[in-house]
C-alpha cells in the first residue's frame, strides 16, 4: 500500500472519529482565513495534516489553548536565505521561532557565484531543514548581461531543475529590457516555468503602470518592489500579487500598507526579501510585518490572512495557508493578536516551539559542506588610482535603509591629479574587484554617506554578482580589507587606519554563507558593527548590507560594478569625472 493511500485512510479514520487523533488543540479561538471569522473550536491532527475542526476530544496528545488565538503558520512570500549569512538549516531554527513555517526562496545569490551547483546545494540543504522551503529558479544570472558573475545560467541550464519537488517556478525577473524586447532566452525561461506547472515572479523596481502591464502580458504575476502606495496599487490593479517587503534595508510596509483595503487585500502578502540574522533575532520575520500592519490600522484578520493564505495562493501552494481539514498542520498559537506574541508553533503536526521557546531536541543540525569556487583576484595599488582633472565628479549617495541611491554631482579638489578622501564632504573611494574568473577588472568610484574617519571595510557579499566591494579612506586600507576577505575564503572585514583587522565574519560557503550556528554569526556581526562604529560616525543603518547593494545595477540610480559606474536611468556606463 502506498504511503499516500495509508495517510489518506488514517486521515479519514481520524476525521470520522473511528480512531483517536494524534493531537488535538482544544478551546482556542481559531481564525478562519477564508472569511476572517473567529470561533472557539477544537482542531484534530493526524500525522502532518489537520483532519477536522469542531467536536473532537480523543487524542494521544492534548494542547490546551484556552484564552489563546490560533492562526495558520506564516509564509514568507519572497526571501533570499543567503542575505541572512546562514544555511537553510539555521534559517529554519530562527524562522520557526518566529512562527514562519514555510518560505519561498530565490537562491540567485549563490547561483551568481556557483551556478547550478549552488542551487542544488541550497535545495539539498532546504530538504534537511524543519522548514518547508520552496524554490523559485533564478531568472537573471547574471542580473544583466554585462555583469561578471561567477556563472551564466541559460534556460537550458535551469530546465532540469524543474524536476525537483520543491521547485515551483521562475524567480524575480529583473532584466526588464530582456522582457520588453522579447529576448529569446528570457522568454524561454518564462515558458519553461509555465509549462512545468510553475509560475513566474517579478521584480518591477521603478516600472511604470504601463510597463507593469507588459510584465503581466509576459506571464509575470507577482512583484515585491513597491515602495509607495501608488506603486502597490498600480500592480494590484493590473492583477499582480503584491508582496509587501520588510527587510533590513528595504522597510516598505508603512509606506505601502495604505494601498490595502478590505476589498483588495487578497492581492497582498508579506515578504522579507533580504534580512540580516540580527534583525530576525530582534524584530522577527513575517510576524513583525503582521505587527506593523496591525499597528498601521489593518484589521488583524486581514493581516493574518495576508501572512498565510494569500501568500500560499499567490504561489499556488494548495495545502498550506489555512486551518482547515486537509491542510498541512502548520499552526501558530498566540497569546496576543495585536502584539503577535507567539506561544506555540506546530510544524507538520509536531510542536517545535512551546512557551515561546524552541525545542532544540528536534533540531538535529547537519554541518553544511560545499566546495566553493576559489576567489580569483590580483588587485594592485595602481588599480585604485582615480585620476582627476576638473574635480567635477559623479558620486553615489547612499540612502540609509534603502537600496536605491542618489546620483550626486559634486566638486572635489584633485590632489596631484588624483582623488584623495574628502573628509569635509564625506566622500571616500569605493572599489569593486572581479573575483570569479581572474579578469583583473576593477571598478573605482566615489561614495558619500558612510562618514568614515579612517580605515576601510570590504565584503564578498555584493549583489548580485558578488564580486568584492570595499570602501575606505586610503588605498592601503582598502587593499588590506580586500586581501583579508580573500584570505578567509570570503566574508566581511573591518580595517582600522593602522591596517589592523578589527573584526571579520568568514563566509566559507561561496563567500555568502557561514557554516556556523546563527547565534555565532550574530555575535560576529555585532563585532563588525562595533568595529564600524570605531572608524565611522554614521549610525542608524547597516553599513555592510548597504554596501552590498551599491553594486546592483538593476536598482536606481547610480551603482558601481567591476567595469565602472552604471547609470540606471540612461542604462549606460559613465565616467567618474563629468565631461562638462
Language model region names:
Residues 1-41, 45-46, 96-98, 281-297, ...:
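Active-site microenvironment of metallo-dependent hydrolases
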Residues 2-15, 20, 92-199, 499-506:
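Divalent-metal coordination cores built from histidine and acidic residues
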Residues 19-22, 57-60, 66, 70-72, ...:
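Short coil/turn connectors at secondary-structure junctions
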Residues 24, 73-75, 135, 270, ...:
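Residue-level marker for buried hydrophobic side chains located in beta-strands
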Residues 28, 48, 67, 78, ...:
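Divalent metal-coordination and catalytic microenvironments
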Residues 80-82, 108-110, 138-143, 173-176, ...:
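Active-site beta-loop-alpha junctions enriched in small/polar residues
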Residues 118, 152-172, 178-243, 250-271, ...:
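Histidine/acidic residue-rich metal-binding segments in metalloenzymes
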Amino acid at each position: 500500500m502506498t504511503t499516500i493511500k495509508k495517510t489518506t485512510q488514517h486521515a479519514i479514520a481520524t476525521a470520522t472519529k473511528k480512531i483517536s487523533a494524534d493531537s488535538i488543540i482544544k478551546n482556542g479561538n481559531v481564525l478562519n482565513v477564508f472569511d476572517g471569522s473567529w470561533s472557539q473550536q477544537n482542531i484534530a491532527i493526524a500525522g502532518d495534516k489537520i483532519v477536522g475542526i469542531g467536536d473532537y476530544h480523543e487524542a494521544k496528545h492534548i494542547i490546551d489553548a484556552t484564552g489563546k488565538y490560533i492562526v495558520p503558520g506564516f509564509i514568507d512570500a519572497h526571501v533570499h536565505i543567503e542575505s541572512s549569512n546562514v544555511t537553510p538549516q539555521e534559517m529554519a531554527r530562527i524562522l520557526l521561532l518566529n512562527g514562519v513555517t514555510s518560505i519561498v526562496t530565490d537562491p540567485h545569490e549563490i547561483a551568481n557565484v556557483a551556478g547550478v551547483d549552488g542551487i542544488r546545494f541550497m535545495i539539498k540543504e532546504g530538504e534537511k531543514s524543519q522548514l518547508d522551503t520552496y524554490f523559485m529558479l533564478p531568472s537573471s544570472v547574471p542580473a544583466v548581461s554585462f555583469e561578471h558573475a561567477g556563472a551564466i545560467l541559460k534556460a537550458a541550464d535551469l530546465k532540469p531543475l524543474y524536476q525537483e519537488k520543491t521547485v515551483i517556478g521562475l524567480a524575480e525577473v529583473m532584466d526588464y529590457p530582456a522582457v520588453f524586447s522579447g529576448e529569446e532566452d528570457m522568454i524561454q525561461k518564462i515558458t519553461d516555468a509555465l509549462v512545468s506547472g510553475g509560475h513566474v515572479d517579478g521584480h518591477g523596481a521603478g516600472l511604470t503602470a504601463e510597463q507593469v502591464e507588459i510584465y503581466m502580458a509576459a506571464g509575470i504575476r507577482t512583484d515585491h518592489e513597491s515602495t509607495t502606495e501608488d506603486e502597490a496599487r498600480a500592480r494590484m490593479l493590473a492583477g499582480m500579487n503584491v508582496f509587501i517587503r520588510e527587510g533590513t534595508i528595504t522597510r516598505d510596509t508603512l509606506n505601502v500598507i495604505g494601498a490595502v483595503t478590505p476589498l483588495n487585500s487578497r492581492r497582498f502578502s508579506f515578504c522579507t526579501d533580504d534580512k540580516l540574522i540580527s534583525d530576525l533575532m530582534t524584530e522577527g520575520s513575517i510576524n513583525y510585518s503582521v505587527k506593523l500592519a496591525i499597528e498601521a490600522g489593518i484589521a488583524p484578520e486581514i493581516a493574518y490572512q495576508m501572512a498565510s493564505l494569500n501568500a500560499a495562493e499567490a504561489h499556488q501552494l494548495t495545502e498550506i495557508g489555512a486551518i482547515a481539514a486537509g491542510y498541512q498542520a502548520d499552526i501558530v498559537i498566540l497569546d496576543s493578536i495585536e502584539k503577535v506574541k507567539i506561544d506555540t508553533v506546530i510544524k507538520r503536526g509536531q510542536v517545535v516551539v512551546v512557551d515561546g521557546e524552541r525545542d532544540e531536541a528536534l533540531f538535529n543540525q547537519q554541518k553544511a559542506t560545499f566546495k566553493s569556487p576559489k576567489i580569483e583576484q590580483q588587485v594592485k595599488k595602481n588599480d585604485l588610482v582615480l585620476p582627476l582633472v576638473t574635480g567635477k565628479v559623479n558620486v553615489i549617495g547612499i540612502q540609509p535603509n534603502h537600496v536605491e541611491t542618489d546620483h550626486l554631482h559634486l566638486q572635489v579638489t584633485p590632489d596631484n591629479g588624483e582623488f584623495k578622501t574628502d573628509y569635509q564632504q564625506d566622500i571616500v573611494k569605493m572599489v569593486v574587484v572581479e573575483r570569479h574568473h581572474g579578469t583583473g577588472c576593477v571598478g573605482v568610484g566615489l561614495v558619500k554617506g558612510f562618514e568614515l574617519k579612517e580605515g576601510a571595510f570590504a565584503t564578498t557579499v555584493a549583489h548580485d554578482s558578488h564580486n568584492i566591494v570595499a570602501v575606505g579612506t586610503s588605498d592601503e586600507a582598502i587593499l588590506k580589507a580586500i586581501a583579508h576577505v580573500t584570505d578567509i575564503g570570503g566574508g566581511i572585514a573591518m580595517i582600522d587606519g593602522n591596517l589592523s583587522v578589527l573584526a571579520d565574519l568568514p563566509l566559507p560557503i561561496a563567500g555568502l554563507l557561514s557554516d556556523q550556528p546563527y547565534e555565532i554569526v550574530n555575535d560576529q556581526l555585532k563585532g563588525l558593527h562595533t568595529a564600524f562604529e570605531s572608524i565611522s560616525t554614521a549610525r542608524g543603518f547597516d553599513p555592510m548590507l548597504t554596501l552590498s547593494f551599491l553594486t546592483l545595477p538593476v536598482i536606481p540610480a547610480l551603482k558601481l560594478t567591476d567595469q565602472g559606474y552604471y547609470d540606471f536611468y540612461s542604462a549606460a556606463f559613465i565616467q567618474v569625472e563629468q565631461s562638462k
